[in-house]
Structure formats: structure tokens, C-alpha cells
Amino acid sequence: MYYKEGCATLQTKPQKQVLGILGGLGPAASCYLYQMLIDHTPATCDQDHIDIVISSRASTPDRTAFIMGKSKDDPFAVMEQDGFSLVHYGATVLAIPCNTAHYFYDRLAEALPDRKSV
């Protein structure tokens, strides 16, 4: 049970899905997505917002350098580990705001098969 300011009664809090943001792969992209989610959520109080867990590991190896063959340092292992961490912390749906990180989408989807979306 929780009390929502402005409501006359206690309500049973509905079970929410939790969004996991696989971020830090360009921290500004993660920040931009988070700000857009806040700005476009029709919330009248903090509790009306989407539950979100964000990983932001800026030290992840450079995706573009790996994709272009300029680095052998594959960022996938870090992305996979962060994906599992997000799931561990309750994420039921994952989002990846970094454009170049989508190169690894198929591998992530295979590694995290129980997620509704990656």
C-alpha cells in the first residue's frame, strides 16, 4: 500500500515493468534518453514516473574502433555483463540509446533471451 499525495485513499501500487538502460556508451545519449522519458511521462508526482535502472559504464571499449577493425578490444563482454546486471536489478525491458551499440544487438538478444526487448 502507498499513499499518493492528492489521493483520498491508500492504493495498492500496481506491479510496474522496469526499464533498464544500457548506457554510458556515449553518456550524453543515456542522459538524453532519460531526460526525454522524464519530460514525456504524464506524472503528477515522483511515483508516477517509470521505474528505471541505468548502467553507465563510460569505460566500455570503443564500439566504433572495434566495428571498423581498428581495435581488437571487443566491447560486447562489458555490454553483456551490464545487461545481466540490469536484469539482476529488476529490468524487464532493456533500451540501448547508443547508435553504434546496436551493432551488437543480435548478440545481446541471444545472451539475454528472457527480456521482452533489447
Model-derived segments and their meaning:
Residues Y2, L10-A77:
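N-terminal glycine-rich anion-binding loop in soluble enzyme alpha/beta folds
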Residues L22-G24, T92-C98:
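Periplasmic-binding protein-like
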Residues D74-V78, I96, T100:
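Short secondary-structure boundary/capping elements
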Residues E80, F84-G90:
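Non-catalytic positions within long, well-ordered alpha-helices that form the structural scaffold/packing
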Residues T100-D114:
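Short Gly/Thr/Asp-enriched flexible loops that form oxyanion-binding sites at enzyme active sites
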Residues V118:
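Conserved small/polar residues in nucleotide/adenosyl-binding loops
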